[in-house]
Swiss-Prot record:
InterPro entries on file: Snake_3FTx (IPR003571), Snake_toxin-like_sf (IPR045860), Snake_toxin_con_site (IPR018354), Toxin_cobra-type (IPR054131)
Signal peptide: 1-21
Cellular compartment(s): Secreted
Function, as annotated: Binds to muscle nicotinic acetylcholine receptor (nAChR) and inhibit acetylcholine from binding to the receptor, thereby impairing neuromuscular transmission.
Any one GO MF annotation of this record: ion channel regulator activity
High-level lineage: Eukaryota, Metazoa, Chordata, Craniata, Vertebrata
Name of the molecule in the record: Alpha-neurotoxin NTX-3
Organism: Naja sputatrix (Malayan spitting cobra)
Length: 83
């Protein structure tokens, strides 16, 4: 009986972990902070920063895109790490 209960506990923990979805901030520049659940098995959040005629611009989201010269990017792997 104890073995059965222990087995069920382990299976429950493993199944709950398989449904995990990374959560990243996705607001742009000075917008109100918002978050989104990443899809497609994304394992990274990013924060991209660059300067244009309006000043510094910031973009946040899921993934870790490649960027052009002059654009600063920080990628991370934990929930809401890209604030």
């Amino acid at each position: 009986m104890k073995t059965l209960l222990l087995t069920l506990l382990v299976v429950t923990i493993v199944c709950l972990d398989l449904g995990y979805t990374l959560e990243c901030h996705n607001q742009q520049s000075s917008e109100t902070p918002t978050t989104t659940g990443c899809s497609g098995g994304e394992t990274n959040c990013y924060k991209k920063r660059w300067r244009d005629h309006r000043g510094y611009r910031i973009e946040r989201g899921c993934g870790c895109p490649s960027v052009k010269k002059g654009i600063e990017i920080n990628c991370c792997t934990t929930d809401r790490c890209n604030n």
